[in-house]
Design a protein with these regions (language model features):
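Protein kinase-like catalytic domain
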Residues: 34, 68, 122-126
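Gly/Gly-Pro-rich "capping" loops immediately C-terminal to redox-active cysteine motifs
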Residues: 35-97
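N-terminal export/targeting leaders of redox proteins
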Residues: 1-18, 127-129
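Short, solvent-exposed loop/helix junctions and linker helices
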Residues: 27, 57, 108-112
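Solvent-exposed, polar/charged alpha-helical surfaces in well-ordered, non-transmembrane soluble domains
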Residues: 22, 51, 61, 65, ...
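Sequence/structural segment immediately N-terminal to covalent heme-attachment motifs in c-type
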Residues: 17-37
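C-terminal capping alpha-helices of c-type cytochrome domains
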Residues: 86-129
Length: 129
């Protein structure tokens, strides 16, 4: 089974059949806000509110942290179900974030591997393109 997962994760992440694409588009529903093309024009009620992923300067590690932890005081949800239980998110606890806590995801939380796959998809499909 591990070999199947390793093979699936090695598929070009920009391919519509890749697990990374499926997580971005469907499971995490990133496209709802960021758009299917990552341009920040997803939600028709708030066009352009989400960042254009083509223009991000975030590193892979920073993308992983943003996906896992969300963005305090914004609508960017956290996808790690344990976010803010300790200080692994921006060095902050839930008590320190308080009312600025990022919302829960619209979908189910993601595993660490799925969060990494979304970051890899964003880097391969959008950043600098």
């Amino acid at each position: 089974m591990g070999a199947v997962v390793a093979f699936a994760m090695s598929i070009d992440p920009t391919c519509a059949q890749s697990p990374s694409f499926a997580i971005y588009q469907d499971k995490a529903d990133c496209q709802f806000c960021h758009g299917p093309d990552g341009d920040g024009r997803g939600d028709p009620r708030s066009p352009g509110k989400a960042p254009d992923l083509h223009k991000t300067a975030l590193t892979r590690e920073q993308l992983i942290e943003v996906i896992a932890c969300g963005r305090p005081a914004t609508e960017m949800p956290h996808f790690d179900k344990y976010a803010y239980e300790d200080k692994s998110c921006y060095g902050l606890s839930a008590a320190e974030v308080g009312k600025n806590m990022p919302p829960d995801p619209h979908s189910t939380p993601l595993t660490r591997r799925e969060i990494e796959a979304v970051a890899d998809y964003i880097l391969a499909a959008f950043v600098g393109k």
